[in-house]
A protein has these predicted regions:
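Structured domain cores in non-transmembrane regions
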Residues: 17-113
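N-terminal amphipathic/basic membrane-interacting segments and domains
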Residues: 2-4
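Short edge beta-strand/loop segments characteristic of extracellular beta-sandwich folds
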Residues: 7-13
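Glycine-rich, aromatic-bearing surface loops/beta-hairpins
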Residues: 95-162
Length: 162
């Protein structure tokens, strides 16, 4: 039974009116794939070394949504008789679905989650096409100011709960 729980809070600041829903997904990987068989040694491809777990983000009022993840959702074990495979969180995505069927994604890295750091992203209010789905986290203040004129903010905040 999972025990390493983190709450994920997503806040939309001045979102567009056509936001339909928000969902979350946690992505895990096995960084050291020595524990897994490699069917194609030349390509280095190892199937099954990634795991995705979707989780709901429930509205709590004022354009704020909450959900939770567990770092120990995937189970560390010896799947193939080659040693214990250890899963690690790679990142967490918050996906905003718009009424035009376009999606916008804000990513929280495992380093941000483990250090309990917030992530703020700029998502375009007017999406050009379905490929315009990445929300940006610029480090340059001038770029952030420029994006601020055409974007709404998505703030993702992790907290440890147990």
């Amino acid at each position: 039974s999972p025990t390493q729980r983190y709450e994920i809070t997503v806040e939309l600041v001045d979102p567009p009116a056509d936001v339909k829903n928000i969902s979350g997904a946690a992505y895990f990987s096995i960084p050291d794939v020595i524990c897994m068989p490699t069917p194609d040694r030349i390509a280095g491809y190892t199937p099954g070394s990634r795991y995705e777990k979707k989780f709901p983000l429930v509205p709590t009022g004022n354009n704020t949504y909450r959900g939770h993840i567990f770092l120990d959702w995937p189970i560390d074990e010896d799947y193939y008789g080659l040693g214990v495979c250890k899963w690690e969180l790679a990142y967490v995505d918050a996906t905003v679905a718009r009424s035009n069927e376009f999606l916008q994604i804000t990513r929280l890295s495992s380093a941000e989650l483990l250090s309990l750091s917030d992530a703020t992203a700029y998502c375009r209010e007017e999406m050009r096409d379905k490929f315009d789905k990445t929300c940006f986290t610029p480090s340059d203040p001038a770029r952030a100011e420029e994006l601020g004129l055409i974007s709404y903010l998505v703030k993702v905040k992790p907290s440890r709960t147990n």
